Amino acid sequence: MNVEEFREYCLSLPGVSEKMPFPNVADRYSRDVLCFYVGDKWFCFVNIEVFDFCCIKCRPEESTELRARYEGVKPGWHMNKKYWNSVYFNQDVPDSIIRELVARSYRLVVESCREGAGAL
């Protein structure tokens, strides 16, 4: 999967928008981060220049299981490690699993918006 295929998949989910929220930070890596939102909440982000991994939200028990199963799943970069995983492209996580994990992350955020005060 390449960055454009990944972006198209994320944007195919209902109500998803995208934004590069860090245009003025000092480090280049963070400036190139593209976040995918449902409502006003992130469910996934990726560096569009390096395209080495995506960071996705997971249930805590799922995060632990995925890290044990795949070398390409690590604790989430710059995120709460209990709920977020970095999933590396072109390692041992098949593209079909990456898409499923993105969809699960999306559903988690949609559920949390419905339960809480987050706008959809």
Please annotate each region the language model reported.
Residues 1-120:
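Charge-dense, helix-prone N-terminal extensions
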